[in-house]
Every structure is written in C-alpha cells, then in structure tokens.
Amino acid sequence: MVSPLAPEAATVAPRSILLVGGTGVISAAATERAAALGHRVTVLNRGQSAARPVPDGVEVLHADIRNRASVREALGTRRFDAVADFISYTPDQAAAAVDLFAGRTGQYVFISSASAYQKPPTRLPILESTPLKNPFWQYSRDKIACEEVLFAAYRERDFPVTVVRPSHTYDRTKIAMVGGWTDIHRMRAGLPVMVHGDGTSLWTLTHSKDFAKAFVGLLGRPQAVGESYTITSDEYLPWNQIYRLFARAAGVAEPELVHVASETIAAASPELGPNLLGDRSHSVVFDNTKIKALVPDYTATIPFADGAREIVAWFDANPASQVLNQDYMDLTDRLTTWARSGQRPAGG
C-alpha cells in the first residue's frame, strides 16, 4: 500500500499508475493529467485512438482486458500504486478484474456511473449515500452489480477498491444533445429540434479535463480505499439552455425547440428510451463535498458555454465526424410535427 498523505495534499508524489483503457472520453484526460503531474503512467488497451492519442512518455501495453491470459502476459510480475479501470461494465467483468489485479495494486479504481443513483430521485442533492436503484436502464443496473461485486471483494478479501461515479462527462468529440451532430445540422438548417420533456429539468455536464483534476487527485490515496465518490461539475443547466448554448456555438441565434415527452420518445424509439427514462429526464444536482474534502484543490472551471463552443469548433474542423443519423432525422420530423399539431404520432 502507498504511504498516507496529509489531507491538504493536492496530489500524491509520483506514483506508478495503470489505466485500463486510457484513450476514451474520460480516460484520455486522466492519462494526460497524470502524465503531466509526473506520475509513471501505463495504459493497457487494444490499440491507439486517432481522436485521443496517448501523450509522449506514457507506456502503452497492448492486450485485450477480456482475455485474462493476454493481460497477465502483458503485465508480467509488475505492481502498481493504482489501477484505474474505465472499461468494466458487467459483474462478470468486475469479478475478472478482482482476479487480475488482487495483489498487484494498492488501489483499484472502478469507474461506475452517477446514473446508478436512485431514479427518480426522492431528494436533492444527490449524495454518495443516495440509494443505488435504476429500474429503467440496464447499463446502470450492471454498474450497480459491478459495485456489489467489488465491495464484496473489499469486505471479504481486502481488495482495495475505490468507486468513482461521474455524470455525463464530455470532451470536444461528444455532443451532449440526444441527436448529436444531427441536432446541430437541424439547427443550422432552420429545422425544429426535439427536446425531451419541457426542457426545464436540470442537468450537469462535466468537461473531461475538469473530471481529471479530481480523478487523478484521488489516485494513490489509501484513505480512498473502500469509499465511493461522485465527481461532477457544480454547474446545473436546464436542457433548454444546453440546446441554446449549442445553437449559439453553431451560429444560430434562436433555434426552434419543440418539446416532446420523454415517454413518447421512448415509445417511438426503444433504443433511446432507457437513457432518457433512466437518466436524462430527471433533474440531477450532485453534492461534491466528499471528493473536495479528499482533493481540496478540485474545482470544475470550464463552463458548458465554453465546452459547447469547443465541441462545435472541433466538428466544424473535422467534416468526417459530421455524420447525420437519418433514423433520428425521421424520428424528429415525425414527433415534432405531432407535437405541434396535437395529433397522435404516426407509428408511435
């Protein structure tokens, strides 16, 4: 186990850190920050990401985390002060991680999800002690099951788990609106854009660089073992404002926002339903007191107005990523026409 730190310490001294994944929306920023702070960083994945290349000086090991033999071969006898797992989603995968990393690390950090918190919430703000229950979304239930496996291993085998629950963390490549680039296209074309509910429910969006400040700050801290932490921004915006910030970033003064009940969207598009009903349709306000007590210098400083501009600028500079989803175009046309007419949506 690594040495305890004073509570006021902003970060640990250089540590050996393994990030499983390391090139995703959340993990790439964590990799970059950990390397910038002087940690000895290794990432383990199946290959490079063109969108988020690994920083210079970071060691890359190639193995498929689902193939335990290949991971053991890649790691050999190495130990790490902290292992951060960004790509375990099911209880079987969590159990495999316990098998792989028990005795190999002083801290195993599991990236869960704030969508695991009680839906609908019975009180705000949401705390780490808020019950974990999501009857709408299998993804969230699987994350809850992962946590149960890992905390059982902590209680029964001293497996050094720390659980982190982020909520809607983004980088420049991820558009927060349900329709993604299709919604930007519709705004610029003067077409109506569908917003779930009445657009007034509150949402939090956290830039991956802000997330990384808190996340890297808890790596290598023994006092975090056996604990769970929410990591989000403290900015809460209604969905109407989120859509308008994207419109402004896209050069559209006033988008036509048409409101459609989340249940109606879910009935018309089963693939969108779980995420809408199990996450986005509920107002969320998170209390970050616990992570700030552990990492006192953590403050999310990137407002989403800046994030929206960064996202649109990146897509404008990368035309190959400007992919229109024709199914979503058709769904939006159908449901916005219905919403404005008051008639039953055809086929809905």
Give the location of each predicted region.
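Active-site "gating" loop of Rossmann-like NAD(P)-dependent oxidoreductase/epimerase domains
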Residues: 113-138, 152-157, 174
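Mid/C-terminal beta-alpha module of Rossmann-like enzyme folds, strongest
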Residues: 217-277, 288, 293, 310, ...
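N-terminal Rossmann NAD(P)H-binding glycine-rich loop of SDR-like oxidoreductase domains
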Residues: 15-39
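NAD(P)-cofactor binding segment of oxidoreductase domains
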Residues: 76-125, 144-149
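Conserved beta-loop-beta element that borders a ligand/cofactor-binding pocket
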Residues: 147-173
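Rossmann-fold cofactor-recognition segment
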Residues: 55-67, 87-88
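Substrate-positioning beta->alpha
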Residues: 177-183, 196-219, 226-227, 240-241
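Short-chain dehydrogenase/reductase
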Residues: 124-148, 177-181, 204-205, 236, ...
